[in-house]
Every structure is written in structure tokens, then in C-alpha cells.
């Protein structure tokens, strides 16, 4: 078995990891181009990742608060007929389905409302599945999330973007 994961999302650092038996790990170290042509994580980054893992293992309140915020924001987006993909993660994909429009909406949200919402376009996703990646955190409050929904509504109107919710969260 091989277990792999990222340190860049929930742990707030960079890099990733694999866990397996010695034979598999040695084979990956010797043959994987992504490993051969990279460098080790700086000690500060490795320690930050270790500290994040230790903290999250023993403190569930931030995870619980983030899950509550994700549920709240998904429900608000659906109430406003904003199409999101159904999933079980903390990332809420707001479907735009057009790369140029996705970039324009993202830029408009930042320039006019101060919301940095990452556009996700091809080749990360298939053409026609372009989306905005919304990630509520544990320190967002309801007012912030409602402001985001309002900003999305206004931006969609400005760009004459028709939104239809096809998935329940």
C-alpha cells in the first residue's frame, strides 16, 4: 500500500508525502522524476507541517468550525441558485463553465469587493467545467460569507451570467 497526501491544503505549508514500506519508498526515491528533480523541504517548512499536524490531531474545534462554515455557505449559495458541485470537502466549487468568464469574474470580485476567489480552468479541470474555488475557513464569520454571496450575485448580474443550481449540497 502507498498513502500519499499534501501538506499544502489543511496543513497550510507546501509539499507532500508518501508512506509505504522501505522497498516502495526506495523505488520511488530512485525513479520518480517528481522526486529526483526536486529538493527537500526547508527545515522551517517541515517543522511547520509537523506542528500543524500535531495541532490538528489534538484540537478539533477549528475543523468543526470550518465544517459548520462550509455547510452554512453551501446552503446560502444554493438558496441563491448559485450552482455548486456536490462534494464532501471544504472546497466549494462554484461552476462558471467558461474559462474567460471565470477569470473575469474572479478579477472583478477582487477588484470591486476584495474577495480573492481562485479561478480553476483547463487543464486543471476539463473544458466546460471551469469554476471558482471557494474555501471558507474557521475564522470566517456569517457576515463575511453573506457578503461573498451578495458579491457573487452582483457580479453575476454585471456579467449577465445565468446561474442554475443543479446539485444539493
Which residues fall in each region the model found?
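Glycine-rich beta-alpha junction loops
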Residues: 9-11, 45, 96-98, 124, ...
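Short, flexible turn/loop "capping" segments at secondary-structure junctions
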Residues: 9-10, 84-86, 126-129
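Short hydrophobic/aromatic beta-strand micro-patches
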Residues: 19, 93-95, 135-137
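Cytosolic Rossmann-like ligand/nucleotide-binding regulatory domains
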Residues: 120-121
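Conserved PLP-dependent catalytic core of the aminotransferase class-I/II
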Residues: 50-112, 116
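Conserved core segment of the aminotransferase class I/II
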Residues: 2-4, 11-60
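PLP-dependent enzyme catalytic core of the Aspartate aminotransferase-like
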Residues: 111-112, 124-169
Amino acid at each position: 500500500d502507498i498513502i500519499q497526501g499534501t501538506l499544502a491544503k489543511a496543513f497550510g505549508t507546501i509539499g507532500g508525502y508518501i508512506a509505504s514500506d522501505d522497498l516502495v519508498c526506495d523505488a520511488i526515491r530512485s525513479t520518480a522524476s517528481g522526486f529526483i528533480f526536486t529538493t527537500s523541504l526547508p527545515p522551517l517548512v517541515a517543522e511547520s507541517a509537523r506542528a500543524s499536524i500535531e495541532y490538528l490531531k489534538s484540537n478539533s474545534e477549528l475543523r468543526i468550525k470550518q465544517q459548520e462554515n462550509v455547510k452554512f455557505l453551501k446552503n446560502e449559495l444554493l438558496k441563491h441558485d448559485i450552482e455548486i458541485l456536490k462534494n464532501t470537502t471544504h472546497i466549494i466549487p462554484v461552476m462558471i463553465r467558461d474559462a474567460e468568464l471565470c477569470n473575469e469574474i474572479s478579477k472583478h470580485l477582487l477588484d470591486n469587493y476584495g474577495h480573492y476567489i481562485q479561478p480553476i480552468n483547463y487543464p486543471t479541470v476539463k473544458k466546460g467545467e471551469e469554476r471558482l474555488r471557494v474555501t471558507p475557513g474557521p475564522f470566517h464569520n456569517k457576515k463575511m460569507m453573506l457578503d461573498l454571496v451578495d458579491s457573487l450575485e452582483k457580479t453575476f448580474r454585471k456579467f449577465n451570467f445565468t446561474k442554475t443550481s443543479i446539485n444539493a449540497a
